[in-house]
Amino acid sequence: MRNAIIRCLFYGSLTFGIWTALLFIYLHHNHVSNWQKKSHEPLSAWSPGKKVHQQIIYGSDQIPKPHVIVKRTDEDKAESTLGMDFNHTNPELHNELLKYGFNVIISRSLGIEREVPDTRNKMCLQKHYPARLPTASIVICFHNEEFHALFRTVSSVMNLTPHYFLEEIILVDDMSEVDDLKEKLDYHLETFRGKIKIIRNKKREGLIRARLIGASHASGDVLVILDSHCEVNRVWLEPLLHAIAKDPKMVVRPLIDVIDDRTLEYKPSPVVRGAFDWNLQFKWDNVFSYEMDGPEGPTKPIRSPAMSGGIFAIRRHYFNEIGQYDKDMDFWGGENLELSLRIWMCGGQLFIIPCSRVGHISKKQTRKTSAIISATIHNYLRLVHVWLDEYKEQFFLRKPGLKYVTYGNIHERVQLRKRLGCKSFQWYLDNVFPELEASVNRS
């Protein structure tokens, strides 16, 4: 009996040992296979993971690596559809809409990064760009921006921009009062140490002068201006840099996709160009079909009479050469049209690059303060008196109450126009935007 028990214990121990050994071999084999598989996967420039704080930042001496977008889990993808069935009668939502101009509740739920759909035309996927292109300084100005929207702007740039083209991101805090934009922002930006500069204005400068401050700290070949509530798309920067590399006097902007203010859903936009009317109100115009003829089709750069002010790229030295912004303009409003006219009339070109896509939250218009309204009028009048020549009467026909409103000293800007040898506004109408002159004849 005793011998039988000993034999049972012996064979039981032997069986357990064999199964343990087999399990170890199986797990080791899986580990090696996974390691070999991962070792052959290319890494993106910033190795984006699920959370920003898990990313590894490489120095500028790293060998360029191709783009790879990490696949997200079903849980992550669900984040992108938040808000489709959102209760829009929520009082908290209403208050936040008034404060920020978009759905902050969903913005917080999305967190500090997400993957957006690739909205480029399929022909864009066949394009290849040189490995040597100008470097870019990204300038993002903000005042009391919602934290998550701002950080998604930054993280999307870091995740989807090759580090060998990205000189720096310059954040200009225009005297924000929101606590989240102070120590909390600094803490999270430590993830991107070495690529981020943050400048905190000691007084409220307004968007125009804040951008000038950011540009003055830039060291990249190209200035890229972004609003503080954007999300860049795949291969967004290379098409812009490539266009500028071919023509240093070309100012370019991406196609602007819409991020819905209520749902924060990322929606593709059609190919359109920037324009304006005699009230100097910016608008989007359809592109003529003949402009997309030829082998490039819908990927061909589109001449644009004007641009909206929030997102564009310009060679830094050229920006300085043509007079930057009018520093005597206040806050924001009109600076985009003034720069558009100056580019075209003074020897440059303005194009939309369809293969570059950037999403932008189309904020709900919040109530403008009297200071903002006064600043916008002031800015428009400076534009009118410097650049419209005899056509300024078309503006005053529509805004007669502004004809005798003061607009400050424009001597410096008039002299700039003479020094640059700029063409007349009539030339602009004849060669760039004849549809605007045609509207005079119809009225």
Swiss-Prot record:
Record field: transmembrane: 5-27
Intracellular or extracellular location(s): Late endosome membrane
Chain positions recorded as substrate binding sites: D174, R204, S228, W332
Protein name: Inactive polypeptide N-acetylgalactosaminyltransferase-like protein 5
Lineage of the organism: Eukaryota, Metazoa, Chordata, Craniata, Vertebrata
Membership in a protein family: Belongs to the glycosyltransferase 2 family. GalNAc-T subfamily.
Origin species: Macaca fascicularis
Gene from which the chain derives: GALNTL5
CDD domains: pp-GalNAc-T
Region of interest: Catalytic subdomain B: 301-363
Membrane topology: Single-pass type II membrane protein
